[in-house]
């Protein structure tokens, strides 16, 4: 069963390509292009830079965790926090996996609706079948191996599309007319916080962290940041040069549309099959399920995400920002637990309050919803405890003001 959830001994470049491919996620292609077209250089950078920095910052944290512990899941790494805190983390992890999978479905449907089919259900069935074929029998090993191929395909497809973009001049100002301040409030804040907090609660990252040799974790994640940056950069350039904001419209219904569909499909499958591996590892390692039950959980995840897509009218960017706020709720608690700088009871109640308030506040907050994303990041600091200071107080019996 272990080989299904961790794959040791792969080449560094294979791990880095897998991390980059998983982090790209299909909608990043659309977001990079549309932000460049509509919001210009500033809007594009508000998406690109946080994405790259996320992998760079997490490299330091992942190295520290691997030096301290071995395991399969994030929840195993925070065992000391107690059952209630673990349940909160599990609930958020499962919610994020459902939302992330739904976002991948939405990304592919944007392409298929222009090219082949209009049914969201058909789109979900097609990509679900492909993802299950990739990892249903081999698990994380199959995911990492195919990610290498998928990254190469994405890069080649992106270059082909860039050289066939119908535009002779570059527009760095964008077409929306929004100021930098407006962009920062409506997109930049939630995006930056949501992205920077993402890996700490994302089981797809932790499976790779625990698969990589501890001496190579830092180097591998830095390499993945560089590999990742190339893909949105290519599609951002397409947005700067193009005369259309929607990339799926830009390349019409011909051969180039097929190239775009292949690129999106590879990005989607990288994240999707990683999500399937993540859900199975959580079910088996945290709930004691058998390998067969773990595989059934993959199907359950696909069904739940399909229903979310079909029964709502939510857009890619909206869902991305919403679940970004949700996963932010447990990012700081994860860091505090790993650093052993927390009070168990205070951290639990601070995390619980954050999980209950921030996502709902974001949904109802209108133009001020970004404030709830900030709250999701900051409120858990109430659970902070400086253990070193506590020890000094016990020794001296007095406070130093």
Specify the residue positions occupied by each region the protein language model found.
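Membrane-interface "cap" regions at the ends of multi-pass membrane proteins
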Residues: 1-30, 135-141, 151, 157, ...
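Membrane-interface helix-loop-helix modules in multi-pass membrane proteins
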Residues: 6-70, 193, 205, 210-244, ...
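Transmembrane helix-loop boundary segments of multi-pass membrane transporters
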Residues: 34-47, 105-121, 141-150, 246-253, ...
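Helix-loop-helix module between adjacent transmembrane segments
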Residues: 45-135, 194, 266-274, 291-293
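Hydrophobic, small-residue-rich membrane helices and short re-entrant helix-turn-helix hairpins
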Residues: 71-79, 138-147, 200-233, 247, ...
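Selective recognition of specific alpha-helical transmembrane segments in multi-pass small-molecule
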Residues: 92-102, 153-163, 191-199, 214-243, ...
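Hydrophobic alpha-helical segments and their helix-loop junctions in multi-pass secondary transporters
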Residues: 98-105, 109-122, 126, 130-142, ...
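A generic transmembrane alpha-helix motif of multi-pass inner-membrane proteins
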Residues: 345-401
């Amino acid at each position: 069963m272990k080989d299904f959830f961790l794959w040791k001994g792969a080449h560094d470049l294979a791990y880095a390509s897998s991390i980059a491919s998983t982090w790209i996620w299909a909608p990043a292609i659309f977001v990079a292009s549309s932000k460049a077209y509509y919001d210009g250089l500033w809007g594009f950078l508000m998406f690109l830079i946080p994405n790259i920095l996320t992998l760079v910052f997490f490299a330091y944290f992942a190295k520290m965790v691997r030096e301290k512990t071995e395991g399969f899941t994030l929840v195993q790494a925070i065992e000391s926090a107690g059952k209630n805190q673990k349940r909160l983390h599990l609930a958020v992890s499962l919610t994020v996996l459902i939302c992330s999978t739904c976002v991948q479905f939405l990304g592919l449907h944007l392409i298929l609706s222009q090219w082949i089919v209009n049914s969201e259900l058909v789109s979900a069935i097609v990509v679900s079948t492909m993802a299950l074929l990739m990892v249903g029998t081999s698990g994380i090993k199959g995911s990492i191996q195919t990610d290498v191929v998928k990254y190469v395909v994405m890069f080649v497809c992106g270059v082909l599309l860039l050289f066939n973009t119908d535009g002779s001049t570059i527009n760095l100002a964008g077409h929306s007319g929004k100021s930098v301040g407006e962009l920062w409030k409506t997109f930049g804040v939630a995006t930056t916080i949501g992205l920077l907090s993402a890996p700490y609660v994302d089981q797809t990252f932790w499976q790779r962290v625990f698969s990589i040799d501890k001496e190579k974790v830092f180097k591998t994640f830095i390499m993945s940041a560089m590999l990742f940056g190339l893909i949105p950069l290519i599609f951002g350039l397409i947005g700067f040069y193009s005369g259309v904001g929607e990339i799926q419209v830009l390349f019409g219904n011909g051969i180039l549309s097929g190239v775009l569909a292949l690129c999106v499909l590879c990005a989607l499958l990288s994240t999707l099959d990683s999500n399937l591996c993540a859900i199975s590892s959580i079910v088996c390692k945290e709930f004691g399920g058998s390998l067969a039950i773990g595989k059934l959980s993959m199907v359950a995840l696909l069904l739940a995400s399909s229903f979310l897509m079909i029964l709502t009218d939510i857009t890619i960017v909206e869902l991305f920002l919403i679940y970004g706020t949700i996963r932010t709720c447990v990012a700081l608690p994860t860091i505090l637990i790993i650093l052993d700088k927390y009070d168990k009871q205070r951290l639990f109640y601070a995390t619980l309050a954050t999980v209950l308030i921030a996502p709902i506040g974001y949904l109802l907050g209108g133009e001020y919803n970004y404030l709830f994303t900030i709250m999701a990041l900051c409120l858990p600091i109430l659970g902070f405890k400086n253990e070193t200071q506590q020890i000094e107080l016990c020794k001296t019996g007095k406070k130093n003001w």
